[in-house]
């Protein structure tokens, strides 16, 4: 597994497709059996429509702030969304840095 020592440096950031222009992500873990963990860097003026996922999603705001559902989520805020739960819309006026964790996909037989 690739190890990243400095999460805040400018290395290993990539354009986050499917998000507002200027959104960047740094993949910390991407494992089919263990899920995915990323740092998501929201630019000023970020916005995203409501959506859902087939796995649970967790947010921990490290820097900045975002708004969703009429509430503000500043640094230190945590949210968890269940599998299939619609969440959003999201916006960030000044940008934010968020730790995002998705649970692994589980196949039900």
Can you annotate each of these PLM segments?
Residues 1-34:
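A short, N-terminal "cap"/entry segment at the start of jelly-roll beta-barrel domains
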Residues 32-35, 43-57, 73:
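A short beta-loop-beta micro-motif enriched in histidine and acidic residues
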Residues 68-88:
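Short acidic-glycine-tyrosine-enriched beta hairpin
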Residues 53-68, 75:
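Glycine- and acidic-residue-biased ligand/ion/polar-headgroup-sensing regions
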Residues 25-27, 37-39, 58, 78-80:
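Conserved hydrophobic/aromatic beta-strand scaffold that supports enzyme active sites
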Residues 83-108:
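Ligand-binding loop in jelly-roll beta-barrel domains
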């Amino acid at each position: 597994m690739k190890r990243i020592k400095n999460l805040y440096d400018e290395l290993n950031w990539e354009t986050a497709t499917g998000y507002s222009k200027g959104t960047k992500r740094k993949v910390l873990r991407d494992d089919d059996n263990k899920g995915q963990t990323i740092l998501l860097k929201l630019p000023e003026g970020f916005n995203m429509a409501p959506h859902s996922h087939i796995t649970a999603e967790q947010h921990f705001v490290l820097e900045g702030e975002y708004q969703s559902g009429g509430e503000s989520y500043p640094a230190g805020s945590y949210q968890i969304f269940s599998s299939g739960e619609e969440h959003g819309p999201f916006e960030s006026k000044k940008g934010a840095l968020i730790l995002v964790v998705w649970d692994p996909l589980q196949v039900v037989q």
